[in-house]
């Protein structure tokens, strides 16, 4: 079986040294766009929607300040689904604009979103159709019910300290265990953010290893897919 569609949105050069990851991608957008970090200015919305891939897959968003771009991806889903978010923070503030702190609140207004399951957060607030869970695969599967799932992973949920934010409490092993338990047939797509600060270049290699581990647990192991030598050598993907 073929691997999933892998897309990289590299707005600040954060994936420049992640050569193996880039070699697995079918599409890499590498260009700085003003007015989208932390929040999306209304006039930037058409530009963002234009660069997003037309089909779902696995999208790498950069650092956590771009997590709100998940909203534009899941807005394309036209069937009932559950959103599962792995995040050290609850990005559900009441704000006028779409920001990295408010995107879940905005997403709850989407027609086809049934519920949100937030895993690993240290912030909990009673919000209609938002559920909380630790890394318990059976509880998470029960919350999914019969619906397909879209997964959004901010690596600041992990306890290994590779992001530009404070570390969470979830071990990489526990995160991967949850991902392995979600049947491939239920996964609509996923995105991953939480890259290191660009100045902390010594964290880049470890961050790439985590990205590859997540891809493996989500898809490669289930598909019995082994990347070829061209990927292991880090040959470049198509870059825009």
Curated annotation (Swiss-Prot):
One of its GO terms (molecular function) is metal ion binding. This is Uncharacterized protein TM_1158.1. InterPro entries: Ureohydrolase, Ureohydrolase_dom_sf. It holds the Pfam family Arginase. The lineage of its organism: Bacteria, Thermotogati, Thermotogota, Thermotogae, Thermotogales. One of its GO terms (biological process) is putrescine biosynthetic process from arginine, via agmatine. It comes from the Bacteria.
